[in-house]
Each structure stands twice: as structure tokens, then as C-alpha cells.
């Protein structure tokens, strides 16, 4: 008796062919699956077990911004998976300058199996996905940073063994892409995300509405507050990002506004978890914690500051997990790429997770 044929539809993955443009486009269970898959692939890497799920695939890496972690992570992840990554920087292609996003997408989609884009406009990355016909992965836009989120919550899960019920406090500019992504993703996964920032730098109503909608189902309690003591109380994770992005001009105003929100050891003690092993510090990097960079020296010269968003003491402390977090960019991006392009057998994802 011959075995029944299994059609492609029957073995198709719930992720196959999909783009990751923003966290909210996936279900909470799917985001959690990618977190766990990233942890699995990290274990395979550590044990030198091959996992060439993308053998023969070609991947375009489109960068409009400079990058250390995202570029390195996508490159090494693609190679580990057996794929060939091709870096195309701002000076290499005509995207948005001499050629429309639609035309560029159609051309690249005919040559590459998937596209990563790190740029500015969310609409641009959405148009790449719309017209290319291949999976597109958002490596960062002004609105969202979804690949960073898989790495971040991988790091949290590695350290605490679970996600639901934890409290993550982001301190700094609450209007940027990191704050947006953290409060939405945390609300999806049952993590209480507090944005601690001056009132003028709180997330938009639109972002808070998205977070609150997910929180209704997950039980998370998202919060935006300017009160540092209230915001950090009970925190398990204190998270920071740069106060001003490279190329922005409003440094003086932003530095003055955010200096009271610098992460210090005293702030960590305010959490109530500094001495019980239930507190870590995270930062998506780069960080201005000393004067060992050109920007650090410029900041010291202009504002008399040797540290900005985080003190060097905290950055180098026992709480610090930013380099573990940075390594996890590679493992998490590998999970995203393999799940959406690798023709893996993932017919469903469990709805219940910790």
C-alpha cells in the first residue's frame, strides 16, 4: 500500500512567505514562538550543530542607515543558515532617489528570495513587501524595530525563564521606535512595560491604544509616566536607549530635558529588586556611558557630561545584559529568517505560553 501524498499546503508553515514589518502584524503566540525558536537556534550554534535551513537562498540587505549589530546579525545569521547575503548601502542602489520603491521592489524581488530594510519610512518597508513578492524584514524604521524585539525578549526569557508578569521599564525618549516597539510587544506577551519619560516625550495615543488593546487579553499593565519613582518601582528590567539619534540637531534641548532620567545605581535601588537577583539592565546600543568615542568627547565638551542615558557604573555592573542582548540579535534574526523563508514544518503555534 502506498503512502498518501502530502501536499505543499498541508506542510506549510504559519510563517512561510510572511514579512515582519511591525510586531503587531503577528499574533502574541507567533512572537513568542520566534523568541523560543531563537533560543533553540542559539543552542544549536553553541553546540556546533549545522542548521542550513536557507541553503541556496539569496538575501538582499538594504541599509539607508549605518549599522553595527543589525548588519552583522543579518550577515552572520544568513551565512549560518546557508544563505548568501548581499549588502546594498545607500550609495549602492537608487531606492527612492532615481527609482521608486515599487520599481526597486519588483526588481529585487525577481532576483532575491528575501529583503531586509533598515531605513526611515515605515511606508517604504511596507511598499517593499507589497511589491517585491518575497518576505521583507524590517531592520528598523522611525516607527518600529521588530527584529530588536525578538532579541530583547529572548534576553529577558533567558534571564528569568518566563515573560508573563515581569515588569520592564524603559527610561528616556518615550516617543522613539524602541519605546513604541517595547510597549506594544510587552503588552502582547504579558510583560508590564512602563515608559518613564518627560510628559512631552510620552508615546502617542495611537501607540498606547495598540498596547492597551493587546494588554486586555494578556493581562499586561502598560504605563507612561514622568514620575521616576512610580515608574521604576517593582522593575525587573531597566532599559535605555540613546537620547538623541545621530544626525538630529536638538541635542541641547533633549539633554536638558532627559538628564534627570539618566539611569544610575540609585535608580536601580528604587526598583526594590536590586538585591534579590530579580533585576537586569538592558540597552540596544550604542550607548553614551563614557567619553571613549568622538560623540562622547563632543558631549563632554559641549555639555560637561561624561555620561548620558546611563552611568558607566551601571553599564559595567552585574546587572548589565546589553552584550548578551546584542549577541541575541543574530540568533533572533536567524529565527525570523528561517521561519519565514525556510519551508519549515510549523503548522501551528501554541497559544499558551509563559
Swiss-Prot record:
Primary subcellular site in the record, as a coarse category: cytoplasm
Cellular localization per UniProt: Cytoplasm
Molecular-function annotations in GO: amino acid binding; ornithine carbamoyltransferase activity
Keyword Glycoprotein: no
GO biological process: arginine biosynthetic process via ornithine; arginine catabolic process to ornithine; citrulline biosynthetic process; L-arginine biosynthetic process
Enzyme Commission code: 2.1.3.3
Spans through the membrane: none
Top enzyme class: transferase
Catalytic activity as recorded in UniProt: carbamoyl phosphate + L-ornithine = L-citrulline + phosphate + H(+)
Keyword Signal: no
Protein's pathway: Amino-acid degradation; L-arginine degradation via ADI pathway; carbamoyl phosphate from L-arginine: step 2/2
One CC-aspect GO term: cytoplasm
Domain of life, per lineage: Bacteria
Binding site for carbamoyl phosphate: 67-70, 94, 118, 145-148, 284-285, 329
Database matches in InterPro entries: Asp/Orn_carbamoyltranf_P-bd, Asp/Orn_carbamoylTrfase, Asp/Orn_carbamoylTrfase_sf, Asp_carbamoyltransf_Asp/Orn-bd, Orn/put_carbamltrans, OTCase_ArgI
Keyword entries, A-Z: Arginine metabolism, Cytoplasm, Transferase
Residues that, per the record, bind L-ornithine: 177, 241, 245-246
Record-stated family: Belongs to the aspartate/ornithine carbamoyltransferase superfamily. OTCase family.
NCBIfam families in the cross-refs: orni_carb_tr
Known function: Reversibly catalyzes the transfer of the carbamoyl group from carbamoyl phosphate (CP) to the N(epsilon) atom of ornithine (ORN) to produce L-citrulline.
Annotated HAMAP family: OTCase
Descriptive protein name: Ornithine carbamoyltransferase, catabolic
Amino acid at each position: 500500500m502506498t503512502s498518501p501524498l502530502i501536499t505543499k499546503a498541508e506542510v506549510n508553515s504559519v510563517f512561510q512567505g510572511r514579512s515582519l514589518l511591525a510586531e503587531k502584524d503577528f499574533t502574541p503566540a507567533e512572537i513568542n514562538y520566534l523568541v523560543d525558536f531563537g533560543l533553540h537556534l542559539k543552542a544549536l550554534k553553541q553546540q556546533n550543530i549545522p542548521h542550513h535551513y536557507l541553503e541556496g537562498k539569496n538575501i538582499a540587505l538594504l541599509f539607508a542607515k549605518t549599522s553595527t549589530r543589525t548588519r552583522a546579525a543579518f550577515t552572520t545569521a544568513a551565512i549560518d543558515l546557508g544563505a548568501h547575503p548581499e549588502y546594498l548601502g545607500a550609495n549602492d542602489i537608487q531606492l527612492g532617489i532615481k527609482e521608486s520603491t515599487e520599481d526597486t521592489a519588483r526588481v529585487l524581488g525577481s532576483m532575491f528570495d528575501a529583503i531586509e530594510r533598515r531605513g526611515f519610512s515605515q511606508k517604504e518597508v511596507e511598499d517593499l513587501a507589497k511589491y517585491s513578492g518575497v518576505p521583507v524584514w524590517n531592520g528598523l524604521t522611525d516607527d518600529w524595530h521588530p527584529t530588536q524585539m525578538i532579541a530583547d525578549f529572548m534576553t529577558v526569557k533567558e534571564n528569568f525563564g518566563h515573560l508573563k508578569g515581569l515588569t520592564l521599564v524603559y527610561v528616556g525618549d518615550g516617543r522613539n521606535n524602541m519605546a513604541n516597539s517595547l510597549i506594544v510587544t510587552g503588552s502582547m506577551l504579558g510583560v508590564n512595560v512602563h515608559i518613564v519619560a518627560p510628559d512631552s516625550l510620552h508615546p502617542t495615543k495611537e501607540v498606547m491604544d495598540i498596547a492597551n488593546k493587546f494588554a486586555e487579553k494578556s493581562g499586561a499593565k502598560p504605563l507612561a509616566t514622568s514620575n521616576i519613582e512610580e515608574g521604576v518601582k517593582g522593575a525587573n528590567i531597566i532599559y535605555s536607549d540613546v537620547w538623541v539619534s545621530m544626525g538630529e540637531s536638538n541635542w541641547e534641548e533633549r539633554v536638558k530635558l532627559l538628564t534627570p532620567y539618566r539611569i544610575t545605581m540609585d535608580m536601580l535601588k528604587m526598583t526594590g529588586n536590586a538585591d534579590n537577583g530579580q533585576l537586569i539592565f538592558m540597552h540596544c546600543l550604542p550607548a553614551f556611558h563614557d567619553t571613549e568615542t568622538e560623540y562622547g568627547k563632543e558631549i563632554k565638551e559641549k555639555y560637561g557630561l561624561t555620561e548620558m542615558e546611563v552611568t558607566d557604573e551601571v553599564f559595567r555592573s552585574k546587572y548589565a545584559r546589553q552584550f548578551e542582548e546584542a549577541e541575541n540579535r543574530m540568533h533572533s534574526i536567524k529565527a525570523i529568517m528561517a521561519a519565514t523563508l525556510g519551508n519549515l514544518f510549523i503548522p501551528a503555534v501554541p497559544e499558551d505560553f509563559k
